[in-house]
UniProtKB/Swiss-Prot annotation:
Keywords: Cell inner membrane, Cell membrane, Ion transport, Manganese, Membrane, Transmembrane, Transmembrane helix, Transport. The chain crosses the membrane at residues 3-23, 41-61, 65-85, 103-123, 132-152, 167-187. Pfam families: Mntp (PF02659). The lineage of its organism: Bacteria, Pseudomonadati, Pseudomonadota, Gammaproteobacteria, Enterobacterales. One of its GO terms (molecular function) is manganese ion transmembrane transporter activity. This is Putative manganese efflux pump MntP. The gene is mntP. Probably functions as a manganese efflux pump. It is found in: Cell inner membrane.
Length: 189
């Protein structure tokens, strides 16, 4: 795969993380650049690892994985999205404290859910002449950039939305999950 195809793939794969990080940035109400960069790093690392895992799986059992990856991604994103919506509706101070304490693991779970399509791409890459390490690094770097940018965009949207920002973030995650499911079921091109 040539450089331009790799970059197109990398930035295409980063769009789910970009959308999810906009919602996350909006729900945090003025996240600092350090928080945005941390989010970008988490999303980028996970998004770089999953195509390598998919590539390894593709060498052995692609038909079994491809049947279920979209259901797993949809389920994770739906559950995380519903949790954000419920927390946005409740919006009690003690729950905000709890969310901040567990923020790292919620970010990791969201990153995993949005990167399952990268794992599926990795399965497909196992059948092509590609350097999987270079491709995975490109995907990870593009995702880090886009997720960091998404958080900063969310920073400006959050104050406008107020308490509804977390609800919007949950709706975005559910929307990403539904999109992944519909694409894999053949309803979207």
């Amino acid at each position: 795969m040539n450089l331009s195809a790799t970059l197109i793939l990398a930035f295409g794969m980063s769009m789910d993380a970009f959308a999810a990080s906009i919602g996350k940035g909006a729900s945090l109400h003025q996240p600092r650049f350090r928080e945005a960069l941390r989010t970008g790093l988490i999303f980028g690392v996970v998004e770089a690892i999953t195509p390598i895992i998919g590539w390894g799986i593709g060498l052995f059992a692609s038909q079994y994985i491809m049947e279920w990856d979209h259901w797993v991604a949809f389920s994770l994103l739906f559950i995380l999205g519903m949790r954000m919506i419920v927390e946005g509706v409740r919006n009690r101070p003690d729950e905000v404290e709890k969310v901040k304490r567990h923020g790292f693991w919620l970010l990791v779970a969201t990153a995993i859910a949005t990167s399952l399509d990268a794992m599926a791409i990795g399965v497909g890459l196992a059948f092509l002449q590609v350097n999987i390490v270079h491709t995975a690094m490109a995907i990870g770097c593009a995702t880090m950039i886009m997720a960091t940018l998404g958080m900063m965009i969310g920073r400006f949207i959050g104050p406008l939305l107020g308490k509804r920002a977390e609800i919007l973030g949950g709706v975005v995650l559910i929307g990403i999950g539904v999109n992944i499911l519909l694409e894999h079921l053949g309803y979207l091109a």
